[in-house]
Amino acid sequence: MLSKGTAGSDGSTAYAQGGVCAALAPTDSPQKHAHDTLLAGSHVNDPVVVDVVCQEGPELVLELAEFGAQFTRMSAYDDNASDEQFHLCTEGGHSQPRVVHAQDATGAEISRALLERVKSHPNITLHDRHAAVALVTSPDRSAVAGIDCLAFDDDEHSTTTLGKPVRFAAPCVCLATGGCGQIYPITTNPAGSTGDGVALATALGAVTDGMEFVQFHPTALAAPPPPGEKPTGRAFLVSEAVRGAGAKLVDANGDAVCRGGMGDLAPRDQVARDIYAAITRQMSDSPAAPQHVFLDAQAVEASGPKGKGGFALKFPTIDAELRRRGIDVSRGDLIPVAPACHYQCGGVCTDLDGRVLGTTSLRVTNMGRTRKSKQRRSRSRSAGRRASGEERAPERVLVHAHGPSSHHRHAQPIAGLFAAGECSSTGLHGANRLASNSLLEGLVFGKRAADAAKLHLKMVRAEGVDVGELALDAPWPFGFDVEACPGEVDVAKAVEESAMQVTAELQALMMSHCGIVRTTRGLLRAAEGVQELGIRLSEIRASGGAVASRVLALVECEFLHAYAREVVNAALHRRENRGLHYNVDHCGDQTEGLEVARSEVVS
C-alpha cells in the first residue's frame, strides 16, 4: 500500500467531517436514499450504480463499526437512549436522517479504524512518502504490471527534495488517489490532492466523464488564521451538518441567503450559487463589503442542555478551530463562510467492479492473451453474477455515461487497473454529489474493486505469468536517471520554482474562468491558457533534463495541468446548465443535453 504522504492522515478522508450515509432509520430505506441521490445528481446518475451503493452501504457501515470505528450513538445526546443506536444526522439534499457520524470528525475516525486493521495484517506493507508518477505495463502493453514512484526519505518530505525512483511490480494496481482540489487557489482538500489517479490512468488511454462537475462546498471558513500562522491554501470546512442541525445562512445585512424550497438544506450546487450571488450583490453595493456570508448557529447553540452549549457539544472540532480564530458561537458570533473547491464528481470511468475503462491497446486480457467476450453483459447482470459468487474472466462491458441513454460502446476494462473513491467516476453522483455519499462510495467500490482484483490475481497466477519479469523489461518513464548529476540540487530548485509559478497561474486561471459560475468566453480563455501553460511545462521539463523527473513539484504540476485540461474540455462540451456546471450563456431549465462529455484518449 503506497501513500504519497502518511497513510491515514494526508488524504482527504481524514478531513471529512460530516459522515457516511446509510439508510438505517426505521423511516428510511435504500430506495429513499437512491431517490435523494438521483435528485441531487440532476438524474444523470447511473441508476443501477445508485441502487447498488444504497443497498450495499448499510452493511458496510455496520462492518466499519465492527472493525472498531467509534460512531456517535444516540446516548451521547439522550441519557435514555440505547448505546447501540447510531445518532443519525440530516444534511443538505436528504429527506431522512441517515448520516452516520463520529461527532464532526468522521473521516479521521474511519481512517484510524481502517489503518489499525491494515497495520495488523501480516500481508500488507505500508510505504509512506511514495509519490506515484507512472503506471508500468507489460512490454506488449496488454496489461498493467506495476507502478513507478518517487520515494522520499524524510518524515515531512519537501518538494525541494529529489525523489528516488522506485518500481513496484504488481499484477493489480488500484488507484485511490482522491481528487484535484489544488487546481483552484482555495480548496478544502489537502496539498497532495493533485489529480494523480486521473493523470496516471488517462496516460494509458482511460476515459473520463463528468469532469465538468466540480463541487464547491458552500461553507468553507472565511476567517484568517490566528496571528503568526501563514495561510496554507487549504480552507477549513464548516460541515453541512451544522446547517442540518439548524444553522442558517445570512448575508451582510442579516437577510436569508437561500430562498428556494429546501432553503439552507438544498443540494450543494444550489447553495453555493446562492452564496456566490449574495456575495456578488454585496460587492456591487459596496466594494468594501465582505467577500463572504455568515452562518448563524444560535439555534444549534440553544439546542444544548439548559439552552446553551449545543454547538460545542455537537461540533467540538469545528468549535475548537473557530475559537482558535477568535470566533465564539457561545457569545453570539456569526461564522464567516464562502464556497471552496471541495470534490470532483467526475473521474476515470469504472464498471461496477471498479475496473478502469479505456479505449487503448490495453485490452481485456489474460496478461497478453486476449479473451474476447462471447456476449455483452449489462451492469445488472454483472451485479447478479457478483451476488452468486460466480468467478468469471473480464469481459467487454457497457460504460455508464451518468445516464442510461448514452453508453461508450468501445470502452473496455484496462487489465489489472482498478480505481475507487474520488478519482473514479462510477456513475453514483451524476451532476452533483449528495452530501456524505463520498465516504459511502469509497466503501462500496473499495470492496468491489478488491474482490475483482482478487479474481484477476487468481487468473494471472493460473497462467504462471511472472509479473516481476514483465515490469523489469518496461522502460523507466520521463528519462529517469538514478545516478547523481553535478549541480542537480540547483537544477532541482530552479525546476521547482518554475513549476510552482505555473501551478499558481493555473489555479488563478481556473478560478477566474472555470469556477462556480462560468461563461463560454471564459471557458475558451481557460482552454487557451491551459494550452499555453502546457507549453511552459514542456520547456521546464526539457530545461531540467533527467533531474526534472525527480522533482515532485513538477510532476504534480503536470498532473494538475492534465486534470484541468479535462475539466475545461468537458465544460466546453456541455451546452446546458446541470448540477454543478452553470454557464450563464446557457440559461435554461436543464431539459437538454443528457450526454456527458467524454475525454479523448491521451497518449
Region spans (language model):
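Conserved redox-cofactor binding core of oxidoreductases
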Residues: A65-E156, T160-K164, A176, L221-P224
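Glycine- and aromatic-enriched mobile tails/lids
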Residues: T6-G8, Y15-C21, E63, A69-P97, ...
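Helix-loop-beta segment of a Rossmann-like dinucleotide-binding subdomain
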Residues: H43-P47, E84-R112, G181-P185, F294-E301, ...
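An anion/pyrophosphate-binding glycine-rich loop and adjacent beta-alpha core
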Residues: L200, A206-H342, L398-V399, A452-K458
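Glycine-rich loop(s) and the adjacent beta-strand/alpha-helix scaffold that form part
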Residues: C172-E229, F236, A435-R448, A452
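Core beta-strand elements of the Rossmann-like FAD/NAD(P) dinucleotide-binding domain
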Residues: T160-C172, Q412-G416
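Conserved N-terminal glycine-rich FAD pyrophosphate-binding loop of Rossmann-like flavoproteins
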Residues: G5-L38, S42, T219, E229
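Short beta-strand to alpha-helix junction loop
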Residues: V48-Q55, P97-E116, H127, T187-G195, ...
